[in-house]
Structures are given as C-alpha cells and as structure tokens.
C-alpha cells in the first residue's frame, strides 16, 4: 500500500491540501525514493525543468534513497541535471545504490551530501541477453560501452582514475557516508543540526 501524506496549508485565502511531494516541490525539493525507471525519470526530469522555469538562479535539492534501476532512465535524469542552469544539490538519505549513486555524484561540485548513516553502493551495469549468438554479442558490446561511459563520467565526477573506478565497480562496493566522501562521490557528510 502506497500511503502519501497530505499537508494542509492555511493562508489568508483559506486552506489548501497538498500531497507531501507537491508541498516539498514548492521549496525546490525533489524526492527520488524508489527504483529508477522511465516513469520515475520522466517525473524527476519534469520537476527539474519546472523548477528551472520558476527560477533559474536558485538551487534545487534532490534527495536520494534509491536502489538504482534503469541505466537509460538514470542518464535522462543525469543529463537534465547537467543541462539546466540551477545547481542541483544531491543528498543521500538511506541508500544510494547503483544508478542512485551515479545520480548522487551528478550534483553540483561542492553540493553533494550524505547523512551520517547513509550508504552508497557502486557497481558495474547489470544486463542480460537472449536470442541468437549475434544478438547476444551485440548486447554484450552495448553493455561494455555503457560501462565505459559510466566509468568515464564517475572518474570525472570523483577525481578517481578510470582504472580505479573499473576495479572498484567490478563487484558491489558498499561505502559509508565518510568513505563516499573520501572517494569523491560526495563532498560532505551532513551532521545533525541539533
């Protein structure tokens, strides 16, 4: 069951009910809290474009708690983050795994964060193929090219060498928030404000 809280906002013109995500969007906050597929990517991209149209100078905040998902859907979000004018701050809450960690690293340099108990997981892209041998070969070549592209971008975003990225993503590689900072996936571990 998917329960989405409602927030009641009272103004001098009366009361208005918002679902929590719409209310957060008013504060330029976007939540990525699920597996990344085309529908999720279209929603995130739409929100990014909407917020840029509202104000192209103010930062946008992308909170990430995601196990990852589709590489092509993730690239749609990544490319939009790089394309729009406002800086996108990325904040890992819970877990940013696979394409979720890639999007975490996609934030504006100096504005990529994780909460102290958050985890980040990087690995190579997953894929499968079936059919005739030539079709399997085509799919295998495609996933290798995709891996090279992901490794190149992660190298640019983290400052790690492509060789190190390739070695570190050969298998699931889980990092604490502090380790993600040391690796260059994030810039700071957020400390409690209390």
Swiss-Prot record:
Keyword entries, A-Z: Cytoplasm, Hydrolase, Protease, Serine protease
Main location: cytoplasm
UniProt entry tagged with the keyword Zinc: no
Enzyme class (EC, first level): hydrolase
Leader sequence residues: none
Catalysed reactions, semicolon-separated: Hydrolysis of proteins to small peptides in the presence of ATP and magnesium. alpha-casein is the usual test substrate. In the absence of ATP, only oligopeptides shorter than five residues are hydrolyzed (such as succinyl-Leu-Tyr-|-NHMec, and Leu-Tyr-Leu-|-Tyr-Trp, in which cleavage of the -Tyr-|-Leu- and -Tyr-|-Trp bonds also occurs)
Enzyme Commission number(s): 3.4.21.92
Cellular compartment(s): Cytoplasm
Active site, UniProt feature: 98 (nucleophile), 123
Oligomeric and partner information: Fourteen ClpP subunits assemble into 2 heptameric rings which stack back to back to give a disk-like structure with a central cavity, resembling the structure of eukaryotic proteasomes.
Protein name: ATP-dependent Clp protease proteolytic subunit
Source species: Staphylococcus epidermidis (strain ATCC 35984 / DSM 28319 / BCRC 17069 / CCUG 31568 / BM 3577 / RP62A)
Highest classification ranks of the organism: Bacteria, Bacillati, Bacillota, Bacilli, Bacillales
Name of the gene: clpP
